[in-house]
Design a protein with these regions (language model features):
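Alpha-helix boundary/capping detector
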Residues: 29, 39-44, 49, 114, ...
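Hydrophobic alpha-helical core bundles mediating ligand binding, dimerization, or RNAP-core interactions
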Residues: 14-19, 38-42
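Conserved N-terminal entry element of GNAT/NAT acetyltransferase domains
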Residues: 1-12, 24-25, 69-75
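Short, polar/charged, Gly/Pro-enriched helix-capping and turn/loop motifs at alpha-helix termini
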Residues: 28, 52-56, 132
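Helix-loop element at the rim of GNAT/NAT acetyltransferase active sites that forms part
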Residues: 1, 16-33, 48
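Acetyl-CoA-dependent GNAT
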Residues: 33-68, 72-109
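Acyl-donor (CoA/ACP) binding surface of acyl/acetyltransferases
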Residues: 1-2, 6-11, 18-20, 80-155
């Protein structure tokens, strides 16, 4: 698994996820977002938390896929699949802290993706960005996220 910067090819995933009204109660989203809005966001984000005051990364999962259905699994190549996104937001450079949030695609839930993504983001945030604190604000109804963050030591 890896975290990477958003690319224009991620627009279909972001459009689907941001407009999933069932998730709005667990986020600050109150209205649908257009493809144009999301395209502008992708075009304007620098990937620099100091400039944007937030950092959104795409969660990619590596998987082996056969080159040809006739070939054995020995002849395979590594492919990636987008399975979610994870954010640092409400960045406070002076106090070196930020909030964390994530979205895991329904087909990837319950497989440890969220926990692994949080660990990767923490490693980057504490090791490279030198943050002192990452905090999570979670809806009481979002038991899946509450469970992940509790396992990771968030209280």
């Amino acid at each position: 698994m890896k975290l990477r910067k958003i690319e224009p090819s991620d627009l279909p995933f972001l459009y689907q996820w941001e407009n999933d009204a069932t998730m709005w109660a667990d986020s600050d989203t109150h209205n649908p977002l257009s493809r144009h809005d999301l395209h502008q966001y992708i075009e304007n984000t620098t990937g620099d938390i100091y400039r944007d005051s937030q950092l959104r990364l795409i969660i990619e999962e590596s998987q082996l896929s056969p080159l040809n259905s006739q070939l054995s699994t020995l002849n395979s190549q590594l492919s990636t699949k987008v399975v979610g996104c994870i954010d640092l937001f409400d960045f406070d450079a002076r106090n070196r802290k930020a909030a964390i949030g994530m979205y895991i695609a329904p087909e990837a839930r319950g497989k440890g993706v969220g926990k692994q993504a949080v660990q990767l983001l923490e490693d980057y945030a504490f090791g490279f960005l030198h943050l002192r604190m990452i905090y999570a604000i979670i809806s009481v109804h979002n038991t899946a996220c509450s469970h992940i963050y509790a396992q990771m030591g968030y209280t």
